[in-house]
Swiss-Prot record:
Record's protein name: Uroporphyrinogen decarboxylase
Source domain of life: Bacteria
UniProt keyword Cytoplasm, yes or no: yes
Keyword Iron-sulfur: no
Gene Ontology process terms (BP): protoporphyrinogen IX biosynthetic process from glutamate
Keywords: Cytoplasm, Decarboxylase, Lyase, Porphyrin biosynthesis
Chief site of localization: cytoplasm
Any one of the GO CC terms: cytosol
Transmembrane segments: none
Record-listed E.C. numbers: 4.1.1.37
Length: 354
């Protein structure tokens, strides 16, 4: 594989010295870019775009042509794994995901297959291989998956949810069924992420989008426990280099110490967390990723730069910070805002790495 020209992102995740703070954006390949909309229209629909390795590669590379980002992230969806389990995933126009066959009982859980990443999910691996080739070693490629808890919320609710009543009912009334589902999902995610690493992903990230809806003890039992299992099962070195893993629970600021205990290399922070406080709490153990409120990108350039400076100052001197948004970029931000953001991170972070 190609030698990396810019490994700032990988070094920061391992808390090794860098010349400036690396930056990328969650959902950086997406609807805020006009060229993405054109490629998606060419594909026909969202899952067709995910399943076409050349088009998935194209949308992965689009933001890198505009902005000086320090990493590329595979263009895919967290719901590829449950889709490969046969739940009948669809995306209606202007709607969120829907499953035709949501999980309601033990028999369904028992009958769920663990997908083979090189057969049912081969289209994802083909995309990873294609992207890695086309990146030509410019920046590292991040692979990813949803967390078992987050995947389970969609599988049990049948789609997106605001109250999570079905899965919480299962959690409190039939916890054994939910644990069996989460265990199967953890095994599936381990296979899936390891296959991405073998195909060329140089770092991986687990998105626990809905972990923050859980009560304190339930978070540890139903979300963190299974992310810990994943961390334990991952390939941590490939191509003669460490493969860092980042765990991100949206709304997870209460549990940073517990997340850091899993053995992950980095913890993602949403925008509700004070990064200075987070570094005091867990910075001796893990790198931190985040954590500007994505809505700041609606502001004037000076305001964006001010926010960047405040977060950089909050983290302070030295490596161990990957700058990012606290969640995915919004689709209607002004076109120049991401450039202002990325350039500000690079310009104003140099002083913290002398």
């Amino acid at each position: 594989m190609n030698q990396l020209k810019n490994d700032r992102y990988l070094k920061a995740l391992l808390r090794e010295p860098v010349d400036m703070t690396p930056v990328w954006m969650m959902r950086q390949a997406g609807r805020y870019l006009p060229e993405y909309k054109a490629t998606r229209a060419e594909a026909g629909d969202f899952m067709a775009l995910c399943r076409n390795a050349d088009l998935a590669c194209e949308v992965t590379l689009q933001p890198l042509r505009r902005y000086a980002l320090d990493a590329a992230i595979l263009f895919s969806d967290i719901l590829t794994v449950p889709d490969a389990m046969g739940l009948g995933l669809s995306f209606g126009a202007g709607e969120g995901p829907k499953f035709a066959r949501p999980i309601e009982n033990k028999a369904q859980v028992d009958n769920l297959p663990i997908p083979d990443p090189e057969s049912e999910l081969q289209y994802v691996m083909n995309a990873v291989r294609t992207i890695r080739r086309e990146l030509k070693g410019e920046v590292p490629l991040i692979g990813f998956s949803g967390s078992p808890w987050t995947l389970a919320t969609y599988m049990v609710e049948g789609g997106s949810s605001k109250a999570f009543t079905k899965i919480k009912k299962m959690m409190y009334a039939d916890p054994k069924i939910l644990h069996a589902l989460l265990d199967k999902l953890a095994d599936s995610v381990i296979l899936y992420l390891n296959a991405q690493i073998k195909a060329g992903a140089q770092a991986v990230m687990v998105f626990d989008t809905w972990g923050g809806v859980l009560a304190h003890n339930e978070y540890k039992e139903f979300s963190l426990r299974y992310m810990h299992k994943i961390v334990d099962g991952l390939i941590r070195e490939n191509e003669g280099r460490k493969v860092p893993v980042t765990l991100f629970t949206k709304g997870g600021g209460l549990w940073l110490e517990a997340i850091a205990e899993t053995g992950c290399d980095a913890v993602g922070l949403d925008w509700t967390v004070d990064i200075a406080d987070a570094r005091r709490r867990v910075g001796h153990k893990v790198a931190l990723q985040g954590n500007m409120d994505p809505s700041v990108l609606y502001a004037q350039p000076e305001r964006i730069e001010l926010e960047v400076k405040q977060i950089l100052a909050g983290f302070g001197q030295g490596s161990g910070h990957v700058f990012n948004l606290g969640h995915g970029i919004h689709q209607d931000v002004p076109e120049q805002s991401p450039k202002v953001f990325v350039d500000a991170v690079h310009e104003y972070s140099k002083q913290y790495h002398k």
